[in-house]
Amino acid sequence: MAQGNNYGQTSNGVADESPNMLVYRKMEDVIARMQDEKNGIPIRTVKSFLSKIPSVFSGSDIVQWLIKNLTIEDPVEALHLGTLMAAHGYFFPISDHVLTLKDDGTFYRFQTPYFWPSNCWEPENTDYAVYLCKRTMQNKARLELADYEAESLARLQRAFARKWEFIFMQAEAQAKVDKKRDKIERKILDSQERAFWDVHRPVPGCVNTTEVDIKKSSRMRNPHKTRKSVYGLQNDIRSHSPTHTPTPETKPPTEDELQQQIKYWQIQLDRHRLKMSKVADSLLSYTEQYLEYDPFLLPPDPSNPWLSDDTTFWELEASKEPSQQRVKRWGFGMDEALKDPVGREQFLKFLESEFSSENLRFWLAVEDLKKRPIKEVPSRVQEIWQEFLAPGAPSAINLDSKSYDKTTQNVKEPGRYTFEDAQEHIYKLMKSDSYPRFIRSSAYQELLQAKKKSGNSMDRRTSFEKFAQNVGRNIPIFPCHKNCTPTLRASTNLL
C-alpha cells in the first residue's frame, strides 16, 4: 500500500516539540468531526461518463458544514478556514495540484491519517524521485506529470545520476505492488499520495505549509525566556496554558531595573530605521555619484602616467592646482572637502575671509591631537583649551552647556579624545552653516568654473601636444648631413 512507502519521518520527541503541533491537533479534531458517520460531511461515489469517482464530496459541502457546526456566520471566513486546512493536506481536490478550497461543485477527498502533517514527515529528494519515476511507469492519463514535476524529475535525475539505477528499481517494485491492488483502492491511494507530495513539494508559487516558523521554534526551545514578561509581570491565561509549564515565582523588579527598562525602550524608539527600498535607492544614488571616480569602471582623467605615458597627472600635481573632478567632489559633502588637503585649504581661506575660521581651526587641531605622540598630548590639550575654550580665549568657539561641562571634566585627565564631544558639536555646526555657505560662495563657484574652462582649453590643445611629444620620444633625431635637401634639413631642425 501507499502507506508502506518509507518516506523520511522524525522521531516522536521531535514531533511533540514541533511548534505547529497545536495547529495540527486543532485541525485534526475538526477533520474527525467532518468524517463522523452521523453529523459529518456526506461522502459519496459519483458516476462520470463510463467511470466512477469514489469517496468524494463537494467544496460547497465543506463550507456549509463549517458554517453549521463551527458557528461561523460569514461564508468568506468559512472558505478561508477550509482553504487553510486544504493547504495542510487534510483534504484535497481530486483533479488539481493547487491545494485550495472552492465554494462550488469541485470534488474533494479526505487524506488518509498516515499522510497527515502531524506525523512530522520530512521526505527526502530520493523519495520524491522514486515517486515521480513510478508515475512515469503507469500509463494513465490521471498520472501524467505536470510541467513542474517533469522539470523536477529531470533535475533529480541529474543530481542522483550515480544511484539512479537503484531509484528506478525501487520505483519499479512499488509500481508492481500497486498493480495488484483493487482498481478503486488504487485510484484513491494514488490521489492521496499525489496530495501528500503537493503539500511537501508544492506547485511553484504556492506556500509550503510544512516550513517551521523560526520565531515559534525559538519560543518552543527556550520557553523560559519567552514566558518572562519584560516588565516582570506574569500573564495568568498564558501560565495556565497546557503547553507552558509553570515557572517559579520571580521577584518584582526594583526601581532601578524599571528605570533601565524605560531607558532601553526610549533608545529603541529613537533608533533610526530605514526600509530596504530606501537603502537600495541610497546605495544606487551613491554609486551613480561616485561612478566617474572609480578607475575600475571608468578610465580616470587625467590617466595614470605609469600606464598611458601621459604626464598630465604629474603636471597637475606639480602645479598644486586641483582638477575639475577634484573641485566637483568637494560639493558631495563636507567630509570630501575635509579629506582633501587643497579642499581644507580653500575652505579655511573662505572662513578666514568671513572672520569665522575658529571652528575649523579647532576641528583641525583636535584631529592633529589624535595623531600626536602620547607624551605630547597633555601639553597640546592645554594649548587647545587656552586657545579655543578657556575664559577669554583669543579664538573662542560656541559650545552648548552640556558639551562644555563634559569637556571641562575631560581636561582634568587629558587624553587624545578629551575634546571628542566638543569636536562633534562643532562638526555639526559647520555642516549645517559654514559648509553650505562655502559651496554657495563665489570663491568656490569661480574655482569650479575656472577648472571647467581650463579643462576645455586643455582638451583642445592636448591632441597636438601629445602627438608632438610621442613623435619626439619615438623618432630618433640624427644630425643633418651636408648633402641633404633644405626641406629635410628644416624638418629635422623642427623636430
From Swiss-Prot:
GO terms for molecular function: G-protein alpha-subunit binding; G-protein beta-subunit binding; GTPase activator activity; GTPase activity. It comes from the Eukaryota. It is found in: Cytoplasm, Cytosol; Cytoplasm; Cell membrane; Membrane. The modification Phosphothreonine is found at T243. Residues 333-448 form the RGS domain. The keyword Iron-sulfur does not apply. The modification Phosphoserine is found at S229, S241, S434. Its main location: cytoplasm. It holds the Pfam family DEP. GTPase activator component of the RGS7-GNB5 complex that regulates G protein-coupled receptor signaling cascades. The RGS7-GNB5 complex acts as an inhibitor signal transduction by promoting the GTPase activity of G protein alpha subunits, such as GNAO1, thereby driving them into their inactive GDP-bound form. May play a role in synaptic vesicle exocytosis. Glycine-dependent regulation of the RGS7-GNB5 complex by GPR158 affects mood and cognition via its ability to regulate neuronal excitability in L2/L3 pyramidal neurons of the prefrontal cortex. This is Regulator of G-protein signaling 7. It comes from Homo sapiens (Human). The lineage of its organism: Eukaryota, Metazoa, Chordata, Craniata, Vertebrata.
